[in-house]
């Protein structure tokens, strides 16, 4: 199973396209097949651009899944830090948390990503030091996203961003939470990635 997952992640774009095609064949209109995660090329380019507007940024990704976005950020962020947070409680393959974490650590091996096994809530309680940009892609529940956004706003983080803005999945509350905290007119959106720059 481990080899299958490695192969799948090695061909992530093709696999995601295949899953999307499968979903449409089965009439999936909820976006649930997109739960496999990952950013589109356009979204990845935007997130990396946001993270590299200045040299020496500390960038935190909350909800790293397998570390694909964090790995790309680590390649792009010059002179800064990239921290990836995940509690490994969910993945699309149903891997046990310890295997999920070990796999993610393997994906991130050789990068400057600091991987922290922690929930978003627990991490926010203990965070120390300057954070220039945060990218939220952990829980997509309204209450959780709203708490993350309010915390980041109060902490004075320069760039507050995340994924799944405008996602039609009825279980997701990202759009509502982000709009309430920041106001719809203050949000820049690329694909389903959003950002507020302060």
Residue ranges and their predicted role:
Residues 30-198:
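S-adenosylmethionine/decaboxylated-SAM
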Residues 1-35, 196:
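Membrane-proximal basic amphipathic "stem/tether" segments
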């Amino acid at each position: 199973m481990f080899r299958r997952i490695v192969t799948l992640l090695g061909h992530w774009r093709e696999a995601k396209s295949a899953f999307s095609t499968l979903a449409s064949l089965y009439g999936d209109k909820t976006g649930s097949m997109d739960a496999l995660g990952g950013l589109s090329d356009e979204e990845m380019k935007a997130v990396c651009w946001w993270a590299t507007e200045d040299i020496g940024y500390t960038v935190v990704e909350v909800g790293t899944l397998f570390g694909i976005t964090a790995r790309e950020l680590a390649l792009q962020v010059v002179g800064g830090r990239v921290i990836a947070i995940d509690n490994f409680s969910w993945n699309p393959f149903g891997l046990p948390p310890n295997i999920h974490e070990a796999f993610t650590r393997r994906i991130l091996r050789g990068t400057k990503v600091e991987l922290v096994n922690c929930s978003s809530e627990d991490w926010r309680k203990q965070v120390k030091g300057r954070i220039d940009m945060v990218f939220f892609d952990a829980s997509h529940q309204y209450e959780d996203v709203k708490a993350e956004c309010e915390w980041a706003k109060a902490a004075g983080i320069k760039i507050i961003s995340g994924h799944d803005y405008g996602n039609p999945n009825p279980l997701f509350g990202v759009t509502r939470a982000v709009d309430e905290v920041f106001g719809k007119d203050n949000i820049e959106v690329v694909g389903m990635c959003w950002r507020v720059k302060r």
